[in-house]
Structures are given as C-alpha cells and as structure tokens.
C-alpha cells in the first residue's frame, strides 16, 4: 500500500525525492496548459501552502474528471515526489493516479469559490470558512497556542483541572450569566410570593453557565498546590463589539502559597513561552498574517519576548495618564477602571513594553481579591501589552475568612451561596493567587486579526447562535 503523506511533511522535506506517496485533500485551484498538462494546487490543512500536482493527459480519467475539477473538490492523488523547476516551491507531486472523492455540486454558486471574500461574508458561512487561507491559518495557530499552554503548565508542575460549566455561583458578581433551566417557560411554577420556584427545576436551585472556573480551581489549588483550568466560559453581556463573545475560552491557573509578585512572574513566563512556540512552529501562517493582515505580527511577538515587563501601581498609572497631556475619550480620575485607550497609552507610548498594573481600587474589582493594608485597594493585576491593552487579569485571592465575608456583603452577594468557597478559608487557609487569560484575546494578539469573532470556529454573540 502506498504511503499516505501530509502536505506539510512533503514540503518540509520529510519525504524523499523519488518516493511514491498518496496525498488526500481538496483542490484550491486548477489550471491547464496547451501541452496537455493540468496543474492542481492541493491543500489538506496540515500547513499553509498547497502542493502542486502535475497531471499528464494520459491519466485514465483526465478528460472525464480531471478537466472538471474545481475549487473545493476532494481528491486522493498518488504520485512521485520530484524536484520542482518552478519558483517558490522545492518539490511537486507528479501524479499517476487521481480519485475524485467528492464534487462541488455547482461551482458557480459554491460559497468558497477561488476569489477574495470579505471577512464579514465569511462569518455568514462559518461552516465553510476554515477552507480559506485566513481561517485555516487561524485554526492552526489556535491549536499551536493551546498545545503550548498545556506544555508550559505541565513542565512547570501544574495539574489540569476540569471545572464545571454549570454552576450556582457568580464568580465575578456582575450578574451577566446565562440561566440553565428545564422548566416549562409557558407554565412556570411559582412561589407563594409569585417568584419563579427554582426548587422545582432540574438542579433544585437557580443555575447558570459558568463565567469562570476560578472558584472551583482555588479548591484544587488548596490541595494540589498548582493547577490550571482551560475551557469555555459564558457571559450574557449584550455587547456587539470586535472584543466581545458570549462564549469564549479561558486559561486560569491558581497557585497556593503565592503572592501577587509570583502571579505576575507566572503570567510573564507563560506568555513568552507560548509566543516562542508559535514563532517556532507556525512560521508559515505567521508570514501570511504579516503579509496580509498586520505587518507587525512577527516583530511584535519577538519584541514582547525580549522585553522586561514594567510594573506600576494603579495610583501611579493614573498619575501618568493625568500628566500625559492626552485628550482621552474617557476622562481619567482615581477610581475609574482603565479603558482600552488608557491601557494602550501606558503600554505603547509611555513604557513601550508590556506592563503590569497592580493594586486597583477595591470598588472596581471582584469580592475575592485580597484587600491591601490601606483598606482602599486590592492585590489585583492586569498585564497590558502593546497593540491590544489588557491581555491578562488576575489577583492574589483573599484568604482571610472575616475579610472575605465583609467583601461578599459589600458586593450585595449572599454568603450562603459561597458556603463551600468560604470553607477553603476555614480549613487550612493559605495565601494563593491566580489569573485569567482570554484565549481568543491571545489569538487576536498573535495573528493581528482584529475581530474576535474570526478567531473562534463558531462565534456566539448577541442574536447569533447559528451553526
């Protein structure tokens, strides 16, 4: 049986010239010469570039099938690897047998015909868009980054923990949650006071899709010392912007016996590790992004790796912004949450490097963040990167039960909803810290693709849950 070879392995020189192999993939383009030859560009998704197959007109099905091949048809091609005389490719496939696995019903109406399509149009055909250069490249980069994240944490002695997608806890206390219910919406059970009786629901209480795996992650960090979660999270935030998704993936490490400084160091080490990985492993895709999407993609990643992270207190950051002379759209004052324009000024213009802003006002941060001695700020941090602004948010967690209870009350939350989380402070409490990295935000930064809807396979946004 002939050896099955990926296009990537052939183009990387892992298949020797003269060897006969079978390539399985799809037609990107076909052109015919007057000399009785057809040139097929075949891709299989294993790398950015297709391989060129040279087809002679003496192949049995040349007239009946080869000359009918169009963009999108699937084929199984067997042939010999040969050095290519053409520019831009080292080898080609001299075909001696081609089987057509699947035809495109009507090439005239095929949504992915061989022409340039707008990124907006591609969102309307999300089930077919991975066949395009840009979305195929995004998918490979996404895979590379995910694998690098898992490798990094494994090498650092972390354990991966699967946290639940269905929860009764609001980690962020913002209330922007998707309710999970099996109740009959046309015949809702009611309490004596007329409220919906969730005790009759599937879980016996009001339940939601998770906004974060952090609280559950803390439980395991307080036993395994170093853990991370990596999975989908959900926010019912009615925002139709290039930066928001209703369903997205989060990377959330938690470390016991750790301070905010340990947290910042972990964030820096992780980001630099995954950026090195993508530069080493996905050079072909990054060159495409550099040429067609963002000319600074590769330079930005290399600069990030070679940068020392600046560190600054929130209060000092506000000072810098006030003295900048910039007319920001959102006015600056102590107590505000930094907007994207503020973050980018700090990273791109003032420090010209990644920067960790820490010790934020407690009133704009979550209840679980450790209260500082000043009583006004919490041990929170954001990692800001040139070109995007915030890329990571984290904190040292509040390990003191009495302080945690006070913060829960201040936020208008119910202590009984967090009984198990409070138990972690009652039984062998320990200083611990962690952060959250929005995975799609990371992909946006790496690829230069500006709309977050284009870096996740099937985006979920307000009034859009197609596919």
Swiss-Prot record:
Keywords: Aminoacyl-tRNA synthetase, ATP-binding, Cytoplasm, Ligase, Nucleotide-binding, Protein biosynthesis. One of its GO terms (cellular component) is cytoplasm. It is found in: Cytoplasm. Its EC number is 6.1.1.22. Its main location: cytoplasm. NCBIfam families: asnS, PRK03932.1. HAMAP family: Asn_tRNA_synth. This is Asparagine--tRNA ligase. It comes from Histophilus somni (strain 129Pt).
């Amino acid at each position: 049986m002939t050896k099955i070879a990926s296009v990537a392995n052939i183009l990387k020189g892992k298949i020797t010239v003269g060897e006969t192999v079978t390539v399985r993939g799809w037609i990107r383009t076909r052109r015919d010469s007057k000399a009785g030859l057809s040139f097929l560009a075949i891709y299989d998704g294993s790398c950015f570039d297709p391989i060129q197959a040279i087809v002679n007109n003496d192949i049995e099905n040349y007239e009946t099938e080869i000359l009918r091949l169009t963009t999108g048809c699937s084929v199984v091609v067997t042939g010999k690897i040969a050095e290519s005389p053409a520019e831009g490719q080292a080898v080609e496939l001299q075909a001696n047998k081609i089987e057509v696995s699947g035809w495109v019903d009507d090439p005239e109406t095929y949504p992915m015909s061989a022409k340039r399509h707008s990124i907006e149009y591609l969102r309307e055909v999300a089930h077919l868009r991975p066949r395009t250069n840009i979305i195929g490249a995004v998918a490979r980069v996404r895979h590379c980054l995910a694998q690098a994240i898992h490798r990094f944490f494994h090498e650092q002695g972390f354990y991966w923990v699967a946290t639940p997608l269905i929860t009764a806890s609001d980690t962020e206390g913002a209330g922007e949650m998707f309710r999970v219910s099996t109740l009959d919406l046309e015949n809702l059970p009611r309490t004596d006071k007329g409220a919906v009786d969730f005790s009759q629901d599937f879980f016996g209480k009001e339940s939601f899709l998770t906004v974060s795996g952090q609280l559950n992650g803390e439980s395991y960090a307080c036993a395994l010392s170093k853990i991370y979660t990596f999975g989908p999270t959900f926010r019912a935030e009615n925002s139709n912007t290039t930066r928001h998704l209703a369903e997205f993936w989060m990377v959330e490490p938690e470390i016991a016996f750790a301070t905010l400084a340990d947290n910042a160091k972990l964030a820096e080490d992780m980001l630099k590790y995954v950026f090195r990985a993508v530069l080493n492993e996905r050079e072909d895709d990054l060159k495409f992004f550099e040429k067609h999407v963002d000319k600074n993609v590769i330079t930005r990643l290399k600069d990030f790796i070679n940068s020392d992270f600046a560190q600054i207190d929130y209060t000092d950051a506000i000072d810098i912004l006030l003295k900048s002379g910039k007319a920001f759209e959102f006015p600056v004052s102590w107590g505000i949450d930094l907007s994207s324009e503020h973050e980018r000024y700090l990273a791109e213009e003032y420090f010209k490097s990644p920067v960790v802003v820490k010790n934020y006002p407690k009133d704009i941060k979550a209840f679980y963040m450790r209260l500082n001695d000043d009583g006004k700020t919490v041990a929170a941090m954001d990692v800001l990167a040139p070109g995007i602004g915030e890329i990571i948010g984290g904190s040292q967690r509040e390990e003191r039960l009495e302080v945690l209870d006070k913060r829960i009350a201040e936020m208008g939350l119910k202590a009984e909803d967090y009984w198990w989380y409070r138990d972690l402070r009652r039984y062998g409490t320990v200083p611990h810290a962690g952060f959250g990295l929005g995975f799609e935000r990371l992909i946006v930064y790496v690829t230069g693709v500006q709309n977050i809807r284009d870096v996740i396979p099937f985006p979920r946004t307000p009034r859009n849950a197609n596919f």
